[in-house]
């Protein structure tokens, strides 16, 4: 399988001069380089970047690895849609957020997760989840929705059928892209998981035990993760 690391966001909460995917771990290793090398064991790896942050990634990756998706601010779903349109893959694809530290356990989960005509989402049960996923609804806490005390949180990685994702992304854009911007009930971006809320795409939840979630939003969260690994 090929992998796409999504690293084209605005990172408004990270507060750093460099993209958060390029943050350095305590051991001096660059996060995106580590994740690239890990995912490379499963197949070719590509990284989405924006017009603004491409120059930072070129210090570590060649142009063939980078997929420029334009200006930031259109959301993770838009970046996935544009990357698939450029790559035109004919097999299942791993989509991975750039703000996660990938471990051997993550690779094991990706290798063993089912592949369907839709989205397979490895999840784990969490107390007070930041994002809460069910097969038919995704709650986004960052947009102020009331969240359950316990729920299933994604592991920042997904296995997708590129044909289904492209088809339902087009359906989403037809309905929610107006005047040069996305517009949904929770914001003005196309979140990748909006496909669950707003299209009839098939979803398989793979509940995973014994795995640490090394994802982050802020610099402090990254610093804490870097000390743990």
Predicted regions and their residues:
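Short acidic/His/Gly/Ser-rich catalytic and metal-binding motifs that mark active-site loops
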Residues: 10-16, 56-57, 167-169
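Conserved N-terminal catalytic core of the sugar/cofactor nucleotidyltransferase
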Residues: 2-5, 13, 29-97, 102-107
